[in-house]
């Protein structure tokens, strides 16, 4: 009964508050893509924006906590997700994966999160077309404007700076490495940075950082004017690395066939079989729920919703993925039926 009530509560909140905020920002950002003259860059921007809708659904699990300002948090997270997805799409489609290029365009994330006070740079200096007609700069400024409204920004700033530095460093390592050196470079990177988490494989540490759910959680929590450093630390310890790892396993599973065909990095390739990453999801959920804070039930709900969002994705029922989805549903434990039911209802109304 508790799971039913919570799933209904989430469904109503998503329908009434989160979805309208996402759609408002989506339509606003869609108009900005019209300024991009180069057709290939415009197509990349619009495709990335479409993907940001699903990212926003994933980010919604960060909006469950008490005293979160849902409307402000949804807008901040969509703005951040839109930049990350745009940068990722550019990198996947660009042959200019040099370190100077990658460091420069990913520095836009620091500007978007108000982590440096320098004037914005020409992020596309090393890009073949030299410019996207200011589209990325607009995204950065729109995100920064929302970040400046966060009442508890100073509480999360140091954590935010640390996580964004790791995230950028990983992206530069991942996208600047050629196919032959990529695995070795990522292993070396993880070995150098992930020593604090011996329970994780090198690929799982990369997963946790690549997820950036920890960054989204911090931004959402900062909408709470009464946020304490202790509360921020406790909640973030549940998300990073545990729920972040669950996120990337699930993302990898729905993109498995696409990435196999395209040659994109997919961390699920490094698990031996379905049973192994099913067991790892259970392990990560157990670790996340070890943190018995006042928000424990919200964290449990966030983990189950995250599973449900991916299990109900259209790709989750394609081919062998149907078997995987049933196993992941079981891994989610009691109450998963109600969460997946609520999410399927949202999908049927094109809210998700």
Residues covered by each model-derived region:
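Acidic (Asp/Glu-rich) catalytic motifs at the cytosolic membrane interface
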Residues: 80-94, 247-258
């Amino acid at each position: 009964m508790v799971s039913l009530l919570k799933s209904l509560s989430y469904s109503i909140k998503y329908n009434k508050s989160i979805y309208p905020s996402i759609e408002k920002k989506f339509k606003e950002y869609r108009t900005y893509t019209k300024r991009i003259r180069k057709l290939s860059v415009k197509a990349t921007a619009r495709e990335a924006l479409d993907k940001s809708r699903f990212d926003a659904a994933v980010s919604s699990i960060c909006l469950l906590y008490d005293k979160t300002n849902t409307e402000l948090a949804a807008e901040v997270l969509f703005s951040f997700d839109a930049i990350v997805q745009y940068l990722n799409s550019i990198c996947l489609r660009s042959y200019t994966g040099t370190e100077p290029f990658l460091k420069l365009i990913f520095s836009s994330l620091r500007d978007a999160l108000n982590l440096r006070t320098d004037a914005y740079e020409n992020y596309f200096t090393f890009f073949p077309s030299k410019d996207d007609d200011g589209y990325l700069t607009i995204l950065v400024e729109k995100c920064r404007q929302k970040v400046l409204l966060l009442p508890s920004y100073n509480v999360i700033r140091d954590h935010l700076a640390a996580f964004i530095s790791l995230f950028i460093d990983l992206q530069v390592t991942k996208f600047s490495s050629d196919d032959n050196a990529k695995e070795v470079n990522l292993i070396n990177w993880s070995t150098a940075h992930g020593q604090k988490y011996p329970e994780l494989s090198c690929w799982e540490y990369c997963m946790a950082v690549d997820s950036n759910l920890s960054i989204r959680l911090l931004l959402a929590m900062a909408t709470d004017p009464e946020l304490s450093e202790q509360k921020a630390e406790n909640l973030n310890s549940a998300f990073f690395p545990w729920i972040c790892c669950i996120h990337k396993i699930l993302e990898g599973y729905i993109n498995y066939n696409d990435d196999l065909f395209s040659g994109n990095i997919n961390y699920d390739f490094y698990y031996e079989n379905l049973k192994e990453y099913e067991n790892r999801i259970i392990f990560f959920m157990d670790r996340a729920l070890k943190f018995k804070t006042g928000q424990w039930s919200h964290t449990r709900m966030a983990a189950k919703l995250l599973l449900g969002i991916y299990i109900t994705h259209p790709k989750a029922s394609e081919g062998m993925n149907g078997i995987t989805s049933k196993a992941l549903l079981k891994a989610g434990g009691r109450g998963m039926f109600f969460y997946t039911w609520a999410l399927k209802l949202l999908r049927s109304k094109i809210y998700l």
